Swiss-Prot record:
Acidic residues bias: start-end ranges: 154-163
Keywords: Nucleus, Phosphoprotein, Repressor, Transcription, Transcription regulation
Protein name in the entry: Mesoderm induction early response protein 3
Primary gene name: Mier3
Modification type Phosphoserine: residues: 52-53, 114, 156, 165, 168
Compartments where found: Nucleus
In-chain residues carrying the UniProt-annotated modification Phosphothreonine: 163
């Protein structure tokens, strides 16, 4: 009964004497073969049987010794030592010594399906061996894996894999070679080097300086003295008191050749012409102007700058000078005279500090060489924003300013120019495309007496023959301050040419370039007497307005 129950309860079925791989047939795949459904049908068929006797048999088998149990199922002991010690040991101890024979369905299926496909067709009966006819070693010729594999089994499997790959475990085991036994043996040098007869290699080194002979303080004094003798005192002045003195290899080499005689080394260093300069030599004014002119023409192409304008310098010196020049005041002046200076305020449209802008305009006007405005070939742009500082002039300020202008333009200075200039009536007017000319339509004077100082109009210029006076033509400054006059109509009615007391017959006056430009915000606050005193210092021509500019 126990045998029948054991055979019926086997989940796999009976296995043949030989180990075969399970290969489902086409019928099993088509009809969806299911082992569990077959087991359920067998259980339904055995419902009428009594399983109480089977339970009793299982209990008896649990109490039976291992040798009797193996003999009952047809097993023979393959290990004699185990058989001999079975009499002296309990069944529990023997069970611990035996490997765990509990296998899962998945593990058995993996082992059965992992072999080579030798036979394509087999049945379920061929998969299960006969339990009563063969030994355990014949059931499973290959080791089966279980859920309770110990670490020793894992190591043995790894060794088997390494052996199968062709490498022994000793070859795959790497050792860290540290110690005296692993060090390389360096043979002693057998040859001898003679400095007089032979050289270590073809290009022999040359000793330039030996630092252990003189004291460091004396060496520093020597370097400072050589710098002063060779014209590098400017470089030394820029060095702060806490910094070290820069080494000069050429000077130290001269000191070594003189056997560390400082006086002799200084004389030889200054006389042989090989003194190395610690900094770049100063650029002349001509070189600076040529560099700036070439920079405007070629941009930052220093090769063209050196080739075209500054041939006395190398390209490296031009590059070094450019970065020094960018940080100097000369660059600021250069930017004001070129397009860079004109675009400075355009890049910042939100500027509200007009005092700084007025100072810049004044510096640009005052820093240029005195030249005539009549030689200008293009009109200057009018500032975009009004200058509010001009509206703060009072009558007393204008009177003082007029007296200073009258002092500069005295009758003697004016008379000396009468022979050099033609009469004003015969002087041609300037071309409109070059210089804007003032006409009567431009003098828009308000009739209500309100100030209109911000309505600046263009200035008039007259061309004159200045060849006897000016031999060289210089450029106008890039930035000029435009000024105009707005006179109320009530003031013009009170003022007449006859009341001014000006003699037009004896003197002919001309506009010169040494006068200052003045803009009056409002003449409404001035009386007729003050106005006459203000205008008596000047000579008026056909127009009531004269634009005077100061270069």
């Amino acid at each position: 009964m126990a045998e029948a129950s054991f055979g019926s309860s086997s989940p796999v079925g009976s296995l043949s004497s030989e180990d075969h791989d399970f290969d489902p047939t086409a019928e099993m795949l088509v009809h969806d073969y299911d082992d569990e459904r077959t087991l359920e049908e067998e259980e339904l068929m055995d419902d009428g049987k009594n399983f109480s006797s089977e339970i009793e048999d299982l209990e008896k088998e649990g109490n039976m010794p291992l040798e009797d149990l193996l003999a009952f199922y047809g097993y023979e002991s393959t290990i004699p030592a185990v058989a001999n010690s079975s009499a002296n040991s309990s069944p529990s101890e023997l069970a611990d010594e035996l490997p765990d024979m509990t296998l899962d369905k998945e593990e058995i299926a993996k082992d059965l399906l992992s072999g080579d496909d030798e036979e394509t067709q087999s049945s379920a009966d061929d998969l299960t061996p006969s339990v009563t006819s063969h030994e355990t070693s014949e059931f499973f010729p290959r080791p089966l894996r279980s859920n309770t594999t110990c670490d020793g089994d894992k190591e043995s499997e790894i060794e088997d894999v390494e052996t199968d790959s062709g490498n022994s475990p000793e070859d795959l085991r790497r050792e860290i070679m540290i110690g005296l036994e692993y060090q390389a043996e360096i043979p002693p040098y057998l040859g001898e080097y003679n400095g007089d007869d032979e050289k270590a290699y073809e290009n022999e080194d040359q000793l330039l300086w030996h630092p252990g002979v003189l004291l460091e303080s004396k060496v520093k004094e020597y370097l400072v003295e050589t710098s002063l003798r060779t014209g590098n005192e400017k470089v030394l002045d820029r060095i702060s008191s806490g910094t070290h003195t820069r080494d000069n290899e050429q000077a130290l080499y001269e000191l070594l050749k003189c056997n560390h005689n400082i006086k002799e080394a200084i004389e030889r260093y200054c006389c042989n012409g090989k003194a190395s300069q610690e900094g770049m030599t100063a650029w002349t004014e001509e070189e600076c102007r040529s560099f700036e002119h070439a920079l405007m023409l070629h941009g930052k192409d220093f090769h063209l700058i050196q080739k075209d304008k500054v041939r006395s310098r190398t390209v490296a010196e031009c590059v070094a000078f450019y970065y020094m020049w960018k940080k100097s005041e000369r660059y600021d002046y250069f930017a004001q005279q070129t397009k860079f200076g004109k675009k400075r305020y355009n890049h910042h449209p939100g500027v509200t500090d007009y005092m700084d802008r007025l100072v810049d305009e004044t510096e640009s006007l005052g820093g240029t060489v005195s030249s005539s405005a009549l030689t200008c070939n293009r009109p200057e742009p009018v500032p975009d924003q009004p200058l509010n500082i001009l509206s703060s002039f009072t009558a007393s300020d204008l009177t003082a300013l007029t007296n200073s202008v009258a002092t500069v333009c005295n009758p003697t200075a004016v008379n000396c120019l009468d022979d050099s200039f033609p009469p004003l009536a015969n002087t041609p007017r300037g071309h409109v495309n070059h210089v804007p000319v003032v006409t009567e339509e431009l003098l828009t004077l308000p009739s209500n007496g309100e100030s209109d100082c911000f309505n600046l109009f263009e200035t008039g210029f007259y061309h004159s023959e200045l060849n006897p006076m000016c031999s060289e033509e210089s450029e106008r400054p890039a930035k000029r301050l435009k000024m105009g006059i707005a006179v109320p109509e009530s003031f013009m009615n009170e003022v007449s040419v006859n009341n001014l007391g000006v003699d037009f017959e004896n003197h002919t006056h001309h506009i010169t370039s040494a006068k200052m430009a003045v803009s009056v915000a409002d003449f409404g606050s001035l009386s007729a007497n003050e106005t006459n005193g203000f205008i008596n210092a000047h000579s008026l021509h056909q127009h009531q307005h004269a634009a005077l500019h100061s270069e």
